[in-house]
């Protein structure tokens, strides 16, 4: 069975909405790949993230904003014959998005982004205190290109 290319934007966005986390990959200052799992929010072809303004992720993004974000969901192990290793496979739905990380500054803009992130996980509004908003790093990725694939569906 071959994997199926997903070309429908609405189907790719449906896959993204089903994911609880994503993996964001970047290239560090030594030219080596660096990938980390993250919580996220998604709205109108923009992916939103938050984290500490200190550390490797922040340093890497400041040096090179090019990123690739991978979403994967609906994993299900399957096999034709459980005694034949090569008949085992994994069903999945996935999306890969490419873009550039852009840091968000200013309390109102940060809060807007944090609300988009939180709306992915909870159907309610939140309040944020000034020190938390001031200290958090918020960045967004405008999707430049998106590719989807499914296998077994």
Where are these regions (language model features)?
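Extreme N-terminal tail/first-helix region
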Residues: 1-18
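Charged, gly/pro-rich active-site loop segments
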Residues: 2-3, 76-153
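Beta-strand-connecting loop/turn residues
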Residues: 45-46, 65, 144-146
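Short, intrinsically disordered, mixed-charge
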Residues: 17, 62-67, 116-123
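N-acyltransferase acceptor-side catalytic subdomain
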Residues: 16-17, 48, 53, 60, ...
């Amino acid at each position: 069975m071959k994997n199926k290319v997903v070309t429908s934007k609405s189907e790719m966005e449906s896959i993204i909405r089903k994911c609880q986390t994503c993996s964001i990959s970047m290239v560090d200052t030594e030219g080596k790949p660096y990938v980390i799992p993250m919580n996220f929010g998604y709205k109108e072809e923009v992916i939103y993230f938050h984290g500490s303004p200190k550390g490797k992720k922040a340093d890497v993004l400041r040096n090179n904003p090019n990123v690739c974000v991978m979403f994967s969901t609906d994993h299900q192990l399957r096999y034709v014959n459980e005694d034949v290793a090569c008949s085992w496979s994994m069903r999945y739905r996935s999306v890969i998005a490419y873009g550039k990380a852009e840091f968000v500054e200013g309390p109102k803009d940060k809060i807007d982004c944090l609300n988009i992130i939180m709306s992915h996980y909870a159907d309610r509004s939140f309040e944020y205190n000034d020190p938390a908003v001031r200290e958090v790093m918020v960045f967004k990725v405008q999707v430049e290109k998106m590719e989807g694939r499914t296998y077994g569906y």
